[in-house]
Amino acid sequence: MLPEPHRLRRHSDFSLTVRRGRRMGRRDLVVHAFDRAQADELVSSGGPRFGLVVSKAVGPAVIRHRVARRLRHICIDLVDSVPRGTDVVIRALPGAATASSRDLEKQLRAGLLRLDLLAPVSNST
């Protein structure tokens, strides 16, 4: 489970991130990111917060919950990598139902990288 300080809970936080944040689409995901320091709110501290949107278009409840669990697990690994004060909303597209966890992680990391929220990983050995 994603720790409470790293979860988006309020509808207003979701809508602010989706409407005013930057967006990057991937094959099975759309990643929205918003820097809370840009908002009129005084709350710009704290770690990154993640929110998930998995609609009925993804599939029946069992599939939607499986996709949400996979994405939540990926977000736990990204908490220390995403800058503090950033809100991230991940919207699953219908293709996410058949995507593997590895594919979802690659797509999410690629989206965050394109939004300049992750440092590129060097493959020097």
Swiss-Prot record:
The keyword RNA-binding applies. It holds the Pfam family Ribonuclease_P. It catalyses: Endonucleolytic cleavage of RNA, removing 5'-extranucleotides from tRNA precursor. Coiled coil: none annotated. Transmembrane segments: none annotated. GO terms for molecular function: 3'-tRNA processing endoribonuclease activity; ribonuclease P activity; tRNA binding. InterPro entries: Ribosomal_Su5_D2-typ_SF, Ribsml_uS5_D2-typ_fold_subgr, RNase_P, RNase_P_CS. Keywords: Endonuclease, Hydrolase, Nuclease, RNA-binding, tRNA processing. SUPFAM superfamilies: Ribosomal protein S5 domain 2-like. It is an enzyme of class 3 (hydrolase). GO terms for cellular component: ribonuclease P complex. Disulfide bonds: none annotated. PROSITE patterns: RIBONUCLEASE_P. It comes from the Bacteria. Its EC number is 3.1.26.5. GO terms for biological process: tRNA 5'-leader removal. RNaseP catalyzes the removal of the 5'-leader sequence from pre-tRNA to produce the mature 5'-terminus. It can also cleave other RNA substrates such as 4.5S RNA. The protein component plays an auxiliary but essential role in vivo by binding to the 5'-leader sequence and broadening the substrate specificity of the ribozyme. HAMAP family: RNase_P (MF_00227). Consists of a catalytic RNA component (M1 or rnpB) and a protein subunit. Belongs to the RnpA family. This is Ribonuclease P protein component. The gene is rnpA.
